[in-house]
Amino acid sequence: MFGCLVAGRLVQTDAQQVASDKFVFNLPDYEHVNHVVVFLLGTVPFPEGLGGAVYLCVPGGAAGQVWQLLGFITNEKPSAIFRISGLKAGEGSSHPFGMMDAPAAPSMAQVGVSVEGLHLLAQQTPVSSSAVSTLDSFTQFTQKMLDSLFNFTSSFALSQSQMSPNPSEMFIPASSIRRWYENFQRRLMQNPNFWKT
């Protein structure tokens, strides 16, 4: 029913069924994995009104076994890419996997899929760092350009006591540049295409 893919590795389609509605993939050597893809194989769709919540369990940590919600897949969204490179043992969320045995090997993580109602999936909040960046190259370029302009202009900053009068030179307060920078960055984060209007 499910598949799991890590770049440079074979596709896993042998999910271990640990309950009637729960499936687990072992993820060896997870420390060297940046992203994981979980998908429906296309052979068996979810029953009407159901989808799959995708969790990650990494070994270790003071709390023992911790499952972190990555996101979900459905018949309408049959695959998803999750970034796991920044996720370590730590705070998890409530999860349906109970007190399953943690992976035996210290470098073995587990990806779990729990079949749940679509209404429940919509209410859950994934770990924020698991989402793949959606910033396009233009937005990234714009942010780098803003940083460069701000850093460049700041390198010429002088206090008023250091300035010598020069009628042909115009001075702009650094606070004005900083205010423009902060406003532009805020608007860019709210709507990367705001400049088109």
From Swiss-Prot:
GO terms for molecular function: Hsp70 protein binding; nuclear import signal receptor activity. GO terms for cellular component: cytosol; nucleus. Coiled coil: none annotated. One of its GO terms (biological process) is protein import into nucleus. Signal peptide: none annotated. The keyword DNA repair does not apply. Keywords: Cytoplasm, Nucleus, Protein transport, Transport. It is found in: Cytoplasm, Cytosol; Nucleus. InterPro entries: Hikeshi-like_C (IPR048364), Hikeshi-like_N (IPR008493), OPI10 (IPR031318). It comes from the Eukaryota. Acts as a specific nuclear import carrier for hsp70 proteins following heat-shock stress: acts by mediating the nucleoporin-dependent translocation of ATP-bound hsp70 proteins into the nucleus. hsp70 proteins import is required to protect cells from heat shock damages. Belongs to the OPI10 family. This is Protein Hikeshi. The gene is hikeshi.
